[in-house]
C-alpha cells in the first residue's frame, strides 16, 4: 500500500498479517485521531512500514495497547526511515518480534522510544531516539533467556525518568533478562540514569559506545548476570562510570577493558547508598579489569569488592589520575582473591591503593607496603605518584 504525500487522520487500525505500507518520508503523515489505538498488528507474517511520519499528537492510548505502534508477534518486521512522534505510551511496542527497526527518528514518547519484549533476532540500528519520558531503547524478556537483539549505531538523547525510582526508568538503552544482546557503537547523551543498563543480561557485549552526561551510573551490568564484555567505551560525565556488581545476587564473569572513564560527580539523582557516587569502575566477581583509563573520579578510581563479595578479580595495566582513592579493595573477612598489578596511579588524594571494610579505609597505602598481611591480595609493580 503506497500513501502519497498528505495528512491521514486515522484511529484503531488493525494491520493484516502481510502488509507493505510505504510513503514519502516526511510528507506522508499519519495522524492519530484518538479514542483507542493507532496501529495494532498481531501474529503477522511479514510487516513493513517505511517512509512514514506517524504522529501520536500526545493523545490517550487505550489499555489494550502498549504503544502508538504495537506489534504482537511478527515473523519478519521492518520499520525503516520513519518518524514516530508524540506517543502517549511507548512509540514502538514490540512483542515476540524478529526483524529490524532502522534509520528512524523517534521522539516525544511518554514512556520509551522502542520497547521490545521476547524478541527473537531483532536488530535496532541507525535510529535516533530522543526526548522520551521514561526510557530510550528497552530490550526485555519476561523470563531470563536468549534474546540476541543487536542494538547498534543509534543516537539516544535526553531521556527522562518521569516515573521516578532508582534505576528502572531513565536509561538510554536498558537490557532486562535478555541474553546474548550486543550493544555497540551507540552515542548516548543526557540520560537521567544510565546510558546503558543491563539487569540480568547474560553474555552481553557493550562495546564502542559513547556515554555522555549520565545522571547515575553510565554503564551498568547488575543483578543475576553471567557474562559481560565491556570494552572500548567512552564515559564522560556521570555519577559512576562502569559498575559490574551484585555478586550477592549471582552477578559474575566479566571483562572490563580499554574503556575511558572521566569527569565523574558525587551528586546523583537520589541520595547515594554507601560508599557514595564518584567511582570510576566497580567490579566484584570473576572479572578482569584491564587497560582502562580513569580520570577525575572523586571517590575511587577502581572499586574492587564490597564486604565479603569479592572473588577472583584482577586489576592490571590501568591508568588512574586525579581520584580520591586510586583503588579501593575489600579486606573484609571472607573476601576472595584480588590481584592489583602494573597500574599507574597519579594524584590520588587519599592514597593510591587502600584496603576497605565496606566504606571505611582501614589500611595504609598498599602501593607502598604490599598486601599488608591480607593473604587474599596480591599487590605488586604499581606506580604511585
Feature annotation, model-predicted:
Residues 1, 22-23:
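Extracellular beta-strand repeat scaffolds in secreted/surface proteins
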Amino acid at each position: 500500500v503506497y500513501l502519497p504525500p498528505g495528512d491521514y487522520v486515522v484511529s484503531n487500525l488493525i494491520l493484516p498479517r502481510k502488509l507493505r505500507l510505504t510513503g514519502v518520508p516526511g510528507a506522508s503523515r499519519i495522524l492519530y485521531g484518538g479514542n483507542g489505538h493507532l496501529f495494532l498488528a498481531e501474529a503477522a507474517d511479514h510487516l513493513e512500514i517505511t517512509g512514514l511520519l506517524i504522529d501520536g499528537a500526545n493523545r490517550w492510548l487505550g489499555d489494550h495497547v502498549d504503544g502508538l505502534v504495537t506489534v504482537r508477534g511478527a515473523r519478519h518486521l521492518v520499520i525503516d526511515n520513519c518518524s514516530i512522534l508524540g506517543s502517549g505510551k511507548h512509540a514502538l511496542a514490540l512483542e515476540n518480534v524478529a526483524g529490524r527497526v532502522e534509520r528512524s527518528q523517534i521522539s516525544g514518547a511518554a514512556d520509551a522510544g522502542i520497547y521490545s519484549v521476547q524478541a527473537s533476532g531483532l536488530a535496532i540500528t541507525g535510529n535516533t531516539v530522543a526526548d522520551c519520558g521514561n526510557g530510550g531503547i528497552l530490550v526485555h524478556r519476561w523470563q531470563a533467556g536468549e534474546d540476541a537483539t543487536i542494538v547498534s549505531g543509534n543516537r539516544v538523547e535526553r531521556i527522562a525518568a518521569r516515573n521516578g525510582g532508582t534505576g528502572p526508568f531513565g536509561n538510554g538503552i536498558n537490557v532486562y533478562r535478555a541474553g546474548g544482546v550486543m550493544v555497540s557503537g551507540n552515542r548516548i547523551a543526557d540520560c537521567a540514569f544510565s546510558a546503558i543498563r543491563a539487569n540480568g543480561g547474560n553474555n552481553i557485549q557493550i562495546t564502542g559506545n559513547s556515554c555522555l552526561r549520565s545522571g547515575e551510573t553510565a554503564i551498568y551490568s547488575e543483578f543475576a548476570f553471567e557474562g559481560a564484555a565491556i570494552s572500548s567505551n567512552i564515559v564522560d560525565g556521570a555519577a559512576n562510570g562502569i559498575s559490574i556488581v551484585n555478586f550477592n545476587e549471582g552477578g559474575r564473569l566479566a571483562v572490563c577493558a580499554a574503556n575511558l572513564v572521566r569527569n565523574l560527580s558525587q551528586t546523583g539523582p537520589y541520595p547515594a547508598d554507601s560508599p557514595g557516587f564518584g567511582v570510576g569502575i566497580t567490579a566484584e566477581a570473576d572479572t578482569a579489569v584491564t587497560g582502562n583509563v580513569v580520570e577525575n573520579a572523586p571517590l575511587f578510581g577502581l572499586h574492587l569488592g564490597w564486604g565479603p563479595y569479592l572473588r577472583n578479580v584482577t586489576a592490571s595495566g590501568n591508568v588512574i589520575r586525579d581520584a580520591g582513592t586510586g583503588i579501593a579493595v575489600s579486606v573484609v573477612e571472607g573476601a576472595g582473591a584480588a590481584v592489583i598489578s602494573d597500574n599507574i596511579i597519579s594524584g590520588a588524594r587519599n592514597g593510591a591503593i587502600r584496603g576497605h571494610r565496606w566504606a571505611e579505609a582501614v589500611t595504609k597505602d598498599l602501593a607502598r607496603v604490599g598486601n599488608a598481611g591480607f593473604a587474599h591480595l596480591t599487590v605488586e609493580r604499581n606506580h604511585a605518584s
